């Protein structure tokens, strides 16, 4: 809960689970978007301009779910501490949890959200980790469970499943190596028509498990349907809005050209993805791309 008035900031590529609640505060708060650069990373210069003494809340994702860009949480926290230390910092860690480390206490993060289904846990279970400054209102009233913050019988199997998933998640894995191998294969397949949508996959500002690229001129939905026949499943944009045939707001925030955005495909790697599986997927893509590029409109 926050006092009325003041500024609320969220990044241009936030998940709708964060963006929509922020937008709902318009009229009560001055709600502003923090822009991205071409790699999909928060522009710190723009954030510095947007931070005002009356800023109440800053929402930023640890890793963008479409581009795989890693946000500079340390620098964001430092700007907050210098310009508006009273502002709450909320981090959506759904795509970063167990893949990247984060120290809430050291950075002064006030709340951190995570979800079980992104680490092979059950769907419908997650956690909101709150720091000592955070005060939240009850989500629902009734029996007073969860310290009276969320009444209702706890989802005990889900909670146990989340813990089991955390304990079982392989800390030592080769996700980045597998992703880089896929990246090189796709570059070979599309040649000069290959476009990367996000940061350099080998860099520290790229998550180890997400690769977004365009194989121009083949439209993403055409390639998706072709690959389904091979039981290779990739995504165009966010999996949460896969039925909406419109350009990705994330790619739009990165100023990706329309034709390139229409060909964008997102690949997700997990600790159990093998080089052999990636090679199989790349072989299927190569076969379909060679045929489909002849028929796609120019």
Over which residues does each language-model region extend?
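Pyridoxal 5′-phosphate
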Residues: 1-298
